[in-house]
Regions:
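Extended, low-polarity transmembrane helix blocks
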Residues: 1-33, 48-58, 65-131
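Conserved catalytic-core motifs of eukaryotic protein kinase domains, centered on the activation segment
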Residues: 36
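Perimembrane loop-to-helix junctions flanking transmembrane segments
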Residues: 39-50
Length: 131
């Protein structure tokens, strides 16, 4: 019954990349620009949030448009893993209890894109077509 959706797998891969990129960028804009405002964030600077904001903004934007997708996804996955262990793991054993479920999910979604690539709606795919 659901096999007919297999034909849309490449496009849905692009949709997943775009939505993930938008959400990741929003974390960066919250930390760097203060928009959208998030409670509990320290002011930007030499804090972990101050350093992670620009990374989320840059990596998220590149991931969103699908430029250098695999290396960007590799870096973002590693960044998410480090963030999980530095910020959340010490607060409890389970992600649902330590508030780390979102960053853990980002880590594995990015890791998936290292293997899967960006999908057809990406700058990478457009550059591949031109070559």
């Amino acid at each position: 019954m659901f096999d007919r959706f297999s034909a849309y797998q490449p496009q849905l891969l692009s949709v997943l990349r775009i939505v993930t990129g938008l959400l990741f960028v929003s974390h960066g804009t919250a930390k760097v620009l203060g928009f959208p405002a998030m409670e509990g964030l320290p002011p930007p600077g030499l804090s972990l949030a101050g350093l992670s904001g620009p990374l989320e903004l840059i990596l998220g934007t590149l991931f969103l448009i699908g430029l250098f997708t695999r290396p960007v996804a590799f870096l973002a996955s590693g960044f998410a893993a480090v963030a999980y262990w530095m910020v959340h793991a010490g607060q409890g054993a389970f992600p649902i209890l330590n508030g780390g479920e979102l960053i853990a999910l980002y880590c594995f979604v990015f890791l998936y894109f290292v293997a899967a690539g960006p999908g057809p709606w990406s700058v990478d795919a457009a550059m591949r077509k031109r070559a």
